[in-house]
Amino acid sequence: MGKYFGTSGIREVVNEKLTPELALKVGLALGTYLGEGRVVVGIDTRTSSEMIKHALVSGLLATGIEVVDIGLAPTPLTGFAIKLYNADAGVTITASHNPPNYNGIKVWDRNGMAYTPDKESELERIIEEETFKRVSWMEIGEVIKADPKKEYIKNAVEQINLENSYTVVVDSGNGAGSIVSPYLQRELGNKVISLNSHPTGFFVRELEPNRKSLDMLSKVVREVGADVGIAHDGDADRIGVVDDQGNFVDYEVMLSLIAGYMIEKYGKGKVVTTVDAGFALDDYLKPRGGEVIRTKVGDVAVAYELSKHGGVFGGEPSGTWIIPQWNLTPDGIFAGALVVEMIDKLGPISELAKEVPRYVTLREKIPCPNELKQKVMRIIEKLALQNFEYKNLIDIDGIRIENEEWWILFRPSGTEPIMRITLEAHTKEKAEELMKKARGLVKEAIEKAKLS
């Protein structure tokens, strides 16, 4: 993790670490790195997004870059617009599922894939050295206003094949997805009921579309007898799903179902996921001809492996999915359309989910200062060896220890000052026993790091 960029671009508290001054420098650095060309810029609904956007755009213009300002736009729309307008890069001003006092800057390449750590490191070098390109008054870039929504919806509809119409409840979480996701479902011929569809930076619910935050969506799906509920985070790069019975579908289960459907739709092939994905995906895909490849957490790592191996699908157990036949940008909106297509072809999710093997997955977050994370991870590796009997240790992203019965992943967040523990076991009792032990281990490591 660099000085500014984490696992998902820059993501910090507004007017503390993420300031207009920093946004200006990022714009200058990106324009300097590109040398010339066109950059698409979109924002989410946060109160600070316009402020950050204008500062960043000023930096781009100062280097002679032409800016295509698409205004309020979910991340998937920015990724789509990069190709639509033949741009050299794109920028989304968003903090995704983080609290409203956060914002962020995420950069995309000309293929719609997030900038790799190497490219972000180059931007950081330019910022630190302040070796910014500055053009003369005659060469300053211009801003072009554009709206790619209709083209996005038109192209998405052409990719989805529905034989029937469905009742779909869409909870946009007051985020940028509210201007696209319900409209795409309607254009597909579905009856749409919208929740939290007014774009605002004062979010009604927690932005992460998980079981806890989607009580209202579950209730509405049950009350109206809907076929499915679709939910998004602030920039709609994620998807959460509620089945036809009004039950939230666990991320791991939904990941397995949609990956299996993509194999059925496009043929046998590789599925890319991250180190925090559990056993279910492997068990579900193996008899269907799917090969699972694991990589670092973050959509850029998934997208890179997809492009490298030619996979049919990539996804994280956080509801972040990449459909390479569509784009290398994580897209919760197009994912929602695919979910309905899966229902159309295979049947209700409540029935499909019964085929996915079930394990007990637990997750916890423990506060940890960013400056201590590296030291804490070194201590965790030593303590894990002393406290757990495991067969394999995987350290491509954090530390994952595992055997045939369970696995535990210790990983520092790349976007927040926390340590994450993710684990899976065959029984609830074993999972809780492992979490108690893992929690104590992380807290001990943090205390030791503070003293050393």
From Swiss-Prot:
EC number assigned by the record: 5.4.2.10
InterPro entries in alphabetical order: A-D-PHexomutase_a/b/a-I, A-D-PHexomutase_a/b/a-I/II/III, A-D-PHexomutase_a/b/a-II, A-D-PHexomutase_a/b/a-III, A-D-PHexomutase_C, A-D-PHexomutase_C_sf, A-D-PHexomutase_CS, Alpha-D-phosphohexomutase_SF
Residue sites binding Mg(2+) per the record: 96, 233, 235, 237
Function: Catalyzes the conversion of glucosamine-6-phosphate to glucosamine-1-phosphate.
Catalysis performed (reactions): alpha-D-glucosamine 1-phosphate = D-glucosamine 6-phosphate
Record PTM Phosphoserine, positions in chain: 96
One GO molecular-function entry: phosphoglucosamine mutase activity
Active site (record annotation): 96
Highest taxon above the source species: Archaea
Keyword terms of this UniProt record: Isomerase, Magnesium, Metal-binding, Phosphoprotein
Alphabetical list of Pfam families matching this protein: PGM_PMM_I, PGM_PMM_II, PGM_PMM_III, PGM_PMM_IV
Protein family (similarity comment): Belongs to the phosphohexose mutase family.
PTM field: Activated by phosphorylation.
Cofactor note: Binds 1 Mg(2+) ion per subunit.
Organism this protein belongs to: Pyrococcus furiosus (strain ATCC 43587 / DSM 3638 / JCM 8422 / Vc1)
Alphabetized NCBIfam families for the sequence: Arch_GlmM
Full protein name: Probable phosphoglucosamine mutase
Matching CDD domains: PGM_like1
GO biological process, one term: carbohydrate metabolic process
Required co-factors: Mg(2+)
